[in-house]
């Protein structure tokens, strides 16, 4: 398995060092659900600004305040404890008067707004996240500036970030031990973290190997191409290569790599052969995903940060602003800019 810090850089390894998250305020995440509350229904959507609190802790506190079971409070995604984050929580409170959530008090948290909603907010049910990231102690401003311009034009690898694999790669190591032992794992959280880490590592490896090719973004026979901004994809035929390549160049289509698991991987012919070869040695992890009936899926190989802008406060400090679709990692953008120091593996996105 390719170590995370050895994954291929799209723009070459950064020349500059820098500090990520010197303070929680240096990493601001604003959740974008992509829809507004209905204004009616048995659920209440609550938008919360938090600093120094993890999502589950706040959700449990909200449940206690509302005198409901913790499972009746849901959210679309985990957000980092060591950052300033805005996100929505959803509480099921049917047949009751609208609770006065302005009275909900928790250190580090502030209720910004709340409204009735018809449906439960489910994990992953968000459009994306808006990020404001401040990088400090940059050693080579010109290198970072050049890279920012390149990222605006060519994007970054859509890697799963280091935080997916746990501190010191603990989640991936757990998956490997599980895969090799075959023993049952009954802890639901461990199962989820370990399976996710296994699939993410296999995806990252495919992308890293493909990026080593000079024509990595050249469509090949059997590639599964994703419609930009959507989850649907189709398999390209030899007759469609030229037209599809033009659409990839225009960012209308995205080349994908497999998230391995049970069932059809989605790609065919030359593309499938490449993916199989890229992770051929990782038989234990592949077998684990099949055994645990994790369904195979696809994910775009490249990521194009939207609304990307930056402002140099001085020669060693830059503020970045960009929007990413759900499931993408801000740290994968930062990785292409600087060799980071600071809190990296603990950032939940």
From Swiss-Prot:
One of its GO terms (molecular function) is RNA binding. InterPro entries: PsdUridine_synth_cat_dom_sf, PsdUridine_synth_TruD, PsdUridine_synth_TruD_CS, PsdUridine_synth_TruD_insert, TruD_catalytic, TruD_insert_sf, TruD_pseudoU_synthase. It comes from the Bacteria. Keywords: Isomerase, tRNA processing. It is an enzyme of class 5 (isomerase). One of its GO terms (cellular component) is cytosol. One of its GO terms (biological process) is tRNA pseudouridine synthesis. The active site is at 80 (nucleophile). Its EC number is 5.4.99.27. Residues 155-303 form the TRUD domain. Substrate binds at residues 27, 129, 329. Pfam families: TruD (PF01142). It catalyses: uridine(13) in tRNA = pseudouridine(13) in tRNA. SUPFAM superfamilies: Pseudouridine synthase. Responsible for synthesis of pseudouridine from uracil-13 in transfer RNAs. Belongs to the pseudouridine synthase TruD family. This is tRNA pseudouridine synthase D. The lineage of its organism: Bacteria, Pseudomonadati, Pseudomonadota, Gammaproteobacteria, Enterobacterales. The gene is truD.
């Amino acid at each position: 398995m390719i170590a995370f810090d050895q994954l291929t850089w799209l723009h070459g390894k950064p020349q500059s060092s820098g500090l990520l998250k010197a303070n929680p305020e240096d990493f601001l995440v604003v959740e974008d659900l992509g829809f507004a509350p209905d204004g009616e229904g048995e659920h209440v959507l609550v938008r919360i600004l938090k600093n120094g609190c993890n999502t589950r802790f706040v959700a449990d506190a909200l449940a206690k305040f509302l005198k409901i079971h913790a499972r009746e409070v849901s959210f679309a995604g985990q957000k980092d404890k060591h950052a300033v984050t805005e996100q929505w929580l959803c509480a099921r409170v049917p047949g009751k008067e609208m609770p006065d959530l302005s009275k909900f008090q928790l250190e580090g948290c502030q209720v910004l707004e709340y409204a009735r909603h018809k449906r439960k907010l489910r994990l992953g049910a968000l459009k994306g996240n808006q990020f404001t990231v401040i990088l400090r102690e940059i050693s080579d401003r010109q290198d970072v500036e050049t890279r920012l311009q390149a990222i605006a034009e060519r994007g970054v690898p859509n890697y799963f970030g280091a935080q997916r694999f746990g501190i010191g790669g603990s989640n991936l190591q757990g998956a490997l031990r599980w895969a090799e032992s075959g023993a049952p794992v009954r802890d639901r959280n461990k199962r989820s973290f370990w399976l996710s880490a296994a699939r993410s590592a296999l995806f990252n490896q495919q992308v890293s190997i493909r990026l080593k090719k000079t024509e990595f973004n050249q469509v090949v026979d059997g590639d599964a191409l994703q419609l930009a901004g959507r989850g649907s994809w189709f398999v390209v035929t030899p007759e469609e290569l030229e037209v599809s390549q033009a659409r990839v160049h225009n960012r209308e289509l995205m080349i994908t790599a497999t998230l391995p698991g049970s069932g059809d991987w989605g790609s065919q012919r030359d593309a499938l052969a490449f993916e199989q070869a890229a992770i051929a040695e990782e038989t234990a992890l592949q077998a684990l995903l099949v055994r645990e009936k994790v369904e195979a899926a696809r994910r775009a190989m490249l990521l194009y940060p939207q609304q990307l802008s930056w402002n140099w406060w001085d020669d060693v400090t830059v503020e970045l602003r960009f929007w990413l679709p759900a499931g993408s990692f801000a740290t994968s953008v930062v990785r292409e800019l600087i060799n980071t120091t600071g809190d990296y593996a603990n950032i939940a996105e």
